[in-house]
Amino acid sequence: MAEKGKRRCSFCGRTEDQVALLMTGMTGYICNECVEHAHDILREEALLPKNDFEMKELPKPKEIKAFLDEYVIGQDKAKCALAVSVYNHYKRLMQRDSADEVEIEKSNIIMVGSTGTGKTLLARTIAKLLKVPFTIVDATVLTEAGYVGEDIESILTRLLQVADYNVEEAERGIVFIDEIDKIARKSDNPSITRDVSGEGVQQGLLKLLEGSVVNVPPQGGRKHPDQKMIPVNTKHILFICGGAFDGIEKKIAQRLNTHVVGYNSVQNRMHIDKGDMMQYIMPQDLRSFGLIPEIIGRLPILTSLRPLDRATLRSILTEPKNSIIKQYVKLMEMDGVKLTFNDDVLEYIVDTAVEYKLGARGLRSIVESIMMEKMFEIPSSGVDSCEITKEYAQKQVEKSTVIKCTV
C-alpha cells in the first residue's frame, strides 16, 4: 500500500514511484500513463466521422446556382440539377450519425455534353464553394488491376493527396471522372472477350460509386503484398462523371423515332435540331452507347449541357469573375500596365472559336496566342499601357498553332 504523503495521480491514484512521470497542475497531478490514455481517446474521437456541414452553413440550391453563375455562363438546366444533387448529398452526410429509419441514397451525377461546354468547370466550381477536396480523373488511363495503366484505386490516391492524406477530409470530397464515355463497351451486349480499359473499368468503378471501403496504396502505383494500405470509405464521396458521348444523338433519335438534322433517317415525323436532342437524353440511351446498367444505376442524376452558341461564348470571354480577359488584365496590372482590348478584337476571338468549333476552352487558347509576345516583351519595356487591336490579334493567331492544329 502506498505511503501517506506521497504524491499520486489525481486520475488513476498511482503514486509517483509507480509511474515514469508525474506532472503537477494547479490543483492536482497527472501521470504519463493517463496522459497517453487521454491522447488515445482524443485521437479516436478525431477519427470519428463528423458532420462538418451544418444546415445553417450548407448553401441552399439557389445559392449554389448563384455562385455557379458567377463563374459559368449559361447551362442553367445543368446548374440546377447539380445544385440540387450536391445539396441533397451533403444533407445526407449530416444524417449519417442519426438513427433515422429513412436512409438517403447517394446522388452521384453524370453530365453529358460536347467538349468545352463547361462540365469540368462546373464540378471544380462546386468544390470551390463547398471547400472540399476535389480531384479530376481521366477515365481513359484507367485499366483493370494487373494491366498496364492506372488502377481504379488511383482515383482515391489522388483525392487523398489533395486532402493532404487526411482520410476524413477525403471521405467527404468530390471526384470528377472525365471522359466516362471513352470506357463504354463497343456494343450494348456483354463482351465475351476481356475489355481491360472499357467494360472492365466500368466493373471496377462500381464499388467506388456505390460506397465501400477500399484499400488504397498511399503513394499511388500498383499494389504489392508488403505495402501498407490506407482504408478509404467511398460511401460519402460524391462522384460526378462527364463525357461528350459523340454520336449519342443518333441513339436518342432512334428511341424517339424522330429525324435529326444532319443524319439520314426514314422517319420524318418531327424535326429537332441536333443541338436540342441532348435535352431528351435518358438512361437507356447511355446503355445503348455502351455504359453497363450497373454503372447507370449508380449515377442516378443525369443532366445534359447544350452546345455553346456565339452569344454565350461572347459572355464567357468577359463576364465571369475569372474570365480569361480579366485574368490578362490583372496580370498586366501587376506589372503596372493598363491592358485594353478593342471590341472588335473580342468579336474576332469569338468568331474564330465558333468557326473552328473550339468551344469555351478554345477561347483561352486564342487569347493566349494573341498575348504571348506582349507578355514576353512588356515587363521589360517600361510602358504603362497596352492596346490590343484586331489587326494585331489576327496576325498573332495566324502565326500560332491554334488554327493550324484544327485544320
Which residue ranges define each predicted feature?
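AAA+ P-loop NTPase nucleotide-binding core of proteostasis motors
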Residues: 2-24, 28-34, 39-135, 139-148, ...
